[in-house]
Amino acid sequence: MYILRSCMEKKVLKIGQISDAHIGDDDRLVQDIDVRKNFLTAYNSESMKDLDLLVLSGDLADNASTDAYSFIAGVIKDSKVPVCIIPGNHDNLEVMEKVFDLKDKVHNGKCYYRYDLDGRSIFFLDSADGTVSSDQLSWLEQETAKIDGEVLLFLHHPPCLCGHKFMDLRYSMKNIAEVQATLSKIKNLKHIFVGHYHSEMTIQLEDKTVYVTPSTQMQIDPNITVFCLSSAAPRWRLIEWGENFMETKVYFSNTP
């Protein structure tokens, strides 16, 4: 958790992050877990009230089905706050485009964009294929250079190894070095929020902090090299971001 309080000129933004919901078809369980119930537990939790923005940071669906995306679309359609979405490695962007309003967010088959909120800028990248394309990296470097204040970044894959023995070994980002080279140039980026690893982790990457948000589907034991489910209870993140101020907390339900 990073906290630095000072005389703040702008309001503190409350951002909710839900990651790796892995919604299946119909009401079928995914790996014997009621993933729809888990998603609703997070979405309807008291911690997600009075948000300024909700971020769904990839792996919305388990098998990229229209039915899964339609379920999520039905849940968020009456949201009183904007919802920003990016795909993960289990998602299919073409199917997502048929269900969600991603107008002006998809470029050459990748979903990446900037979202401005209360005078601050939040960036979203597409790492669904396990990489962040050079086009996205060039765009990110150019766009962040136009901004005087601090920015936030969301993407699905962590741009670093995290000490997660199972995920680092099998499913880490494929072009970490290239991504880190670009990120190191962006001095007004201090906080990066990701998912993918089904664990809560906080990693220091030079002058930036990478916050790995756990899953609403299930959690994976980070301490062994083979897959081992450590919990089927949903977890999600609340971010409070102000001027020279960042506070973030992961919430969880005790019952799956």
Swiss-Prot record:
Its EC number is 3.1.4.-. It comes from the Bacteria. Fe cation 2 binds at D59, N89, H156, H196. Keywords: Hydrolase, Iron, Metal-binding, Nucleotide-binding. Binds 2 Fe(2+) ions per subunit. Its cofactor is Fe(2+). AMP binds at H22, D59, N89, H90, H198. SUPFAM superfamilies: Metallo-dependent phosphatases (SSF56300). One of its GO terms (molecular function) is metal ion binding. Transmembrane segments: none annotated. InterPro entries: Calcineurin-like_PHP_ApaH (IPR004843), CNP_phosphodiesterase-III (IPR050884), Metallo-depent_PP-like (IPR029052). Fe cation 1 binds at D20, H22, D59, H198. Belongs to the cyclic nucleotide phosphodiesterase class-III family. This is Probable cyclic nucleotide phosphodiesterase Fisuc_1441/FSU_1912. It comes from Fibrobacter succinogenes (strain ATCC 19169 / S85).
